[in-house]
Amino acid sequence: MITLTKEDGPADLDGVTHLSIGVSWDPTGGASGGIMGVLRRKAGTDLDLIAIAMQGPDPVRLAGLDSLDPMGNGSLVHSGDNQTGRGDGDDETVTVEFARLPGNVTSIVFVAAAFKKGSSFQKARNISFKVYDATGGSSQQVADIWPSLLTQDNGCAVAKAVRVGGSWKLEVVNVTGKIKQGDEHALMRFAISK
């Protein structure tokens, strides 16, 4: 397994028919100690993994939040909303089946966001993005992408899958920014700027 960075440049996805990206995090009490820290850790925090299908510069479909199969054909599927970060493994996952994507989809931007009011990256620890080759029905982790822990932002454009002719490439974006919480248009504007 490798850890992908922006400096690595785009990775060829030749032979990869199904790609999954997962996000996991651990809840934290933030800077609160004592009873407040215990209560915050117990409540957890809600980060969201969102995949935005692009047609050139325009967002055309969003997988995540309450939209689990926006194409309606299983080509871009979200696992569902984990609102606490508790449990083992990935808390949320998006899976792409490249051959079933409509031809007008030119790229997919994967974004993690503390999107709902009251959630923040500061209330999560050990945020990790995992990339899986899910070809053939079994998922094999092929890479990790780790965002900076120093951000005060609430959004991270993690990676972007780009159609190049008849194949796809995956490039690490790993850029953070501020997104107005609860505003899907702000989320999409953030994604298309990457």
Task: Kindly label every feature range from the protein language model.
Residues 1-107, 111-194:
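Intrinsic-disorder/low-complexity signal
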